[in-house]
């Protein structure tokens, strides 16, 4: 499920919706909206292809796993992490 995939692959940089590399670009709802990452499609693209300091996970995770993570991130952002 999205939570366990997130814990295993994303939490080292994004624990609690934060961003240890770029503190301005968190996974909190207001930042997702600000940077146009507030949809499943946008998050799937970011996770699959990577960008800047964030590595691409397209070769490591299946499309289904990436979509599960995207849905998890959006759900957590809605709840305020």
From Swiss-Prot:
GO CC annotation terms, alphabetical: plasma membrane-derived thylakoid lumen
Pfam families (alphabetical): Cytochrome_CBB3 (PF13442)
Entry keyword set: Electron transport, Heme, Iron, Metal-binding, Photosynthesis, Thylakoid, Transport
Upper classification of the organism: Bacteria, Bacillati, Cyanobacteriota, Cyanophyceae, Oscillatoriophycideae
GO MF entries: electron transfer activity; heme binding; iron ion binding
Name of the protein described by the UniProt record: Cytochrome c6
InterPro entries in alphabetical order: Cyt_c-like_dom, Cyt_c-like_dom_sf, Cyt_C6, Cyt_C_IC
Protein family per UniProt: Belongs to the cytochrome c family. PetJ subfamily.
GO terms under biological process: photosynthesis
Keyword Transport part of the UniProt annotation: yes
Positions contributing to heme c binding: 10, 13-14, 54
Modifications made to the protein after synthesis: Binds 1 heme c group covalently per subunit.
Domain of life where this protein originates: Bacteria
Entry keyword annotation includes Thylakoid: yes
Summary of the function given for this chain in its UniProt record: Functions as an electron carrier between membrane-bound cytochrome b6-f and photosystem I in oxygenic photosynthesis.
Organism: Microcystis aeruginosa
SUPFAM superfamilies: Cytochrome c
Subunit structure: Monomer.
Compartments, as annotated in UniProt: Cellular thylakoid lumen
């Amino acid at each position: 499920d999205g939570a366990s995939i997130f814990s295993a692959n994303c939490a080292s940089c994004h624990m609690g919706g934060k961003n240890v590399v770029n503190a301005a670009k968190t996974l909190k709802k207001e930042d997702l909206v600000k940077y146009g990452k507030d949809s499943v499609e946008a998050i799937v693209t970011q996770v699959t292809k990577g960008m800047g300091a964030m590595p691409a996970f397209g070769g490591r995770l299946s499309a289904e796993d990436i979509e599960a993570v995207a849905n998890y991130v959006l759900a957590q952002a809605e709840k305020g992490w």
